[in-house]
């Protein structure tokens, strides 16, 4: 799957779950499970409930995603 195939959406973190997973509510109102991308993990970016984030979704599974950016 190439970078062009991913769907980027904005959302808000609702809850921090075990194993670096987060429940995120997208702007469209859908709730998904998302994990942190490797670069956020390497740079120790903290993500807390209430943070605005950018999430990448695969077109194959729209219920799971990867958090790629945390808004300031």
Curated annotation (Swiss-Prot):
Which keywords accompany this UniProt record?
Answer: Cytoplasm, Initiation factor, Protein biosynthesis, RNA-binding, rRNA-binding
Spell out the GO cellular component terms annotated for this protein, sorted alphabetically and separated by semicolons.
cytosol
Localization per Swiss-Prot or TrEMBL: Cytoplasm
PROSITE patterns from the UniProt entry: S1_IF1_TYPE
Q: Domain of life, per the record?
A: Bacteria
Q: Which SMART domains does the entry link to?
A: S1 (SM00316)
InterPro entries given for it? Answer: NA-bd_OB-fold (IPR012340), RNA-binding_domain_S1_IF1 (IPR006196), S1_domain (IPR003029), TIF_IF1 (IPR004368)
Database matches in Pfam families: eIF-1a
One MF term in GO for this entry? rRNA binding
Q: Where is the S1-like domain?
A: 1-72
Family to which the UniProt record says this protein belongs: Belongs to the IF-1 family.
Q: Which HAMAP family match?
A: IF_1 (MF_00075)
Record NCBIfam families: infA
Q: How does it assemble?
A: Component of the 30S ribosomal translation pre-initiation complex which assembles on the 30S ribosome in the order IF-2 and IF-3, IF-1 and N-formylmethionyl-tRNA(fMet); mRNA recruitment can occur at any time during PIC assembly.
Functionally, this protein is described as follows: One of the essential components for the initiation of protein synthesis. Stabilizes the binding of IF-2 and IF-3 on the 30S subunit to which N-formylmethionyl-tRNA(fMet) subsequently binds. Helps modulate mRNA selection, yielding the 30S pre-initiation complex (PIC). Upon addition of the 50S ribosomal subunit IF-1, IF-2 and IF-3 are released leaving the mature 70S translation initiation complex.
| Name the record gives this protein | Translation initiation factor IF-1
Species this protein is from: Clostridium kluyveri (strain ATCC 8527 / DSM 555 / NBRC 12016 / NCIMB 10680 / K1)
What gene name is given for the protein in this entry? infA
């Amino acid at each position: 799957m190439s970078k062009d195939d991913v769907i980027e959406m904005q959302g808000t973190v609702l809850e921090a779950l075990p194993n670096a997973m987060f429940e995120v509510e997208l702007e469209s109102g859908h709730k998904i499970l998302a994990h942190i991308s490797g670069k956020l993990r390497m740079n120790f970016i903290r993500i807390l409930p209430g943070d605005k984030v950018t999430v990448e979704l695969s077109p194959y599974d729209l219920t799971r995603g990867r958090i790629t950016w945390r808004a300031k």
